[in-house]
Amino acid sequence: MTPLLELKDIRRSYPAGDEQVEVLKGISLDIYAGEMVAIVGASGSGKSTLMNILGCLDKATSGTYRVAGQDVATLDADALAQLRREHFGFIFQRYHLLSHLTAEQNVEVPAVYAGLERKQRLLRAQELLQRLGLEDRTEYYPAQLSGGQQQRVSIARALMNGGQVILADEPTGALDSHSGEEVMAILHQLRDRGHTVIIVTHDPQVAAQAERVIEIRDGEIVRNPPAVEKVNATGGTEPVVNTASGWRQFVSGFNEALTMAWRALAANKMRTLLTMLGIIIGIASVVSIVVVGDAAKQMVLADIRSIGTNTIDVYPGNDFGDDDPQYQQALKYDDLIAIQKQPWVASATPAVSQNLRLRYNNVDVAASANGVSGDYFNVYGMTFSEGNTFNQEQLNGRAQVVVLDSNTRRQLFPHKADVVGEVILVGNMPARVIGVAEEKQSMFGSSKVLRVWLPYSTMSGRVMGQSWLNSITVRVKEGFDSAEAEQQLTRLLSLRHGKKDFFTWNMDGVLKTVEKTTRTLQLFLTLVAVISLVVGGIGVMNIMLVSVTERTREIGIRMAVGARASDVLQQFLIEAVLVCLVGGALGITLSLLIAFTLQLFLPGWEIGFSPLALLLAFLCSTVTGILFGWLPARNAARLDPVDALARE
């Protein structure tokens, strides 16, 4: 008969300083399917080390160990995990149940890593618990169960994937005599069902219940009676089959990892909340700065547009402040007509201006009188609260009409409801009021100077007596590039004048400069916010590292029941990402509250959350979770199962 478990000259040594301490010294042992074997020895005899090697939790330093003819030395970590999952079931002295899972969920764990579908897994767990007399305790947590009940849950977990070989480490060591007898009775039943049962104990009375007692002392076997031949030994109950395959198994495994991660986080609510706090603040900072910064930028740009965008102003001279007399008369009415004929010009309005006195009855104030065309008000986005602008007939006839700004109206007519039709003196010229223009309110503030507008023909012919213009404002048609239009305008006037005796001021250039400045400022503030997100990510990493340390025994349990290193890595990585995603969602909620609060105090601001901003926030959360969760997850996946199980 071929042995199920075959050990030949197994040695295991551990480093102790500069020396190697040999714990197992040439162990040779055969265990057959269906046997009930007890390995007995005093503390320090090497029996636990031998059990770890038998259960593929540890590897021998030298020698050969075969499981059903398969040499385990040739297997990698994942293959060893599969071997544990499909052939071995562990029963520990301290039960090693996961405290945040119910009895039913604890029993299901091995089948999760085997890829068994959820419905099958649930039915099998319930069947095993019912068989062991725990059908009314399936939803109980370990802390709610007695020691004997916890050990029975541990036995059910060992049987979940079939449990061909049951490895029981001091199964009665933490139990009272009655519970211990119940556990031994269950082990005898498992032997009768065809399971191979290996009991590791220091208690001779427990060992005596086995068919074969192997004694180990100082790393050597001192007693090894021959095996009792079993008839029709099957080597265990039917293996669990019908596992999902391909992408379904991957999706199912991911869902289970997500569920387990959520349960682990829910079991430590305060720690989870503290872990999330840094992410909440970081995401809220990033989203708030991006959204509020964008609202501020749009408001600034709107203010700039309110004073005229897509416009080019032409002034005489070389630059602002140039009062050289030879340039004062550079711009003529013929230049205006030539500009208006260009295909890229939507409108062109001249301007002549002079500071004059305005009088009405006994009110006498100083104001800036500006001669313009009717298009001037459209160019600068001005509206009329009363009346209207002057028409072409009034321009051609040098009509004595005037448009007031709202401040001038208030100074001259503080008590009149309607001022259209009233006559005032502009300088020494009487003029009839035909409208009141409202300038757009700007965050840059309003001018304190009172302003009135007359037809440019009236201003130059009747008031100032000059034949030249102080400036020309050109509005570029939609679809034409403003910079290209500025070049063509410069070329046109230079050809007409034979020299460049003027300069231009492009408002689009100002707009682009402001856009660049606000973009740079927003980027800087975003980087500051990203730093807070990075700090939050480091906090996640620190807490997850602590979590790995605290949950070392849990990791060992999962590996013992068949979890691969990749399964452990996936679970802890999902936990980190889950923390960051939930923290990100709370951070977005916080940023929404901040935005709505700001909007209450800043009614002119239009704060909106674009889908892109929300997507970027969740992307940041996910990336943060992956980046800062990878190191703790990797540390967890690299743990040695024997060392992990030994830690408390």
From Swiss-Prot:
Residues 5-243 form the ABC transporter domain. The chain crosses the membrane at residues 273-293, 523-543, 576-596, 611-631. It is a multi-pass membrane protein. GO terms for molecular function: ATP binding; ATP hydrolysis activity; transmembrane transporter activity. One of its GO terms (cellular component) is plasma membrane. InterPro entries: AAA+_ATPase (IPR003593), ABC3_permease_C (IPR003838), ABC_transporter-like_ATP-bd (IPR003439), ABC_transporter-like_CS (IPR017871), MacB-like_ATP-bd (IPR017911), MacB_PCD (IPR025857), Macrolide_Exporter_MacB (IPR050250), P-loop_NTPase (IPR027417). GO terms for biological process: response to antibiotic. Keywords: Antibiotic resistance, ATP-binding, Cell inner membrane, Cell membrane, Membrane, Nucleotide-binding, Translocase, Transmembrane, Transmembrane helix, Transport. It holds the Pfam family FtsX. ATP binds at residues 41-48. PROSITE patterns: ABC_TRANSPORTER_1, ABC_TRANSPORTER_2, MACB. It is an enzyme of class 7 (translocase). The keyword Secreted does not apply. It is found in: Cell inner membrane. Its EC number is 7.6.2.-. Gene3D superfamilies: P-loop containing nucleotide triphosphate hydrolases (3.40.50.300). NCBIfam families: PRK10535.1. Part of the tripartite efflux system MacAB-TolC. MacB is a non-canonical ABC transporter that contains transmembrane domains (TMD), which form a pore in the inner membrane, and an ATP-binding domain (NBD), which is responsible for energy generation. Confers resistance against macrolides. Homodimer. Part of the tripartite efflux system MacAB-TolC, which is composed of an inner membrane transporter, MacB, a periplasmic membrane fusion protein, MacA, and an outer membrane component, TolC. The complex forms a large protein conduit and can translocate molecules across both the inner and outer membranes. Interacts with MacA. This is Macrolide export ATP-binding/permease protein MacB. It comes from Escherichia coli O6:K15:H31 (strain 536 / UPEC).
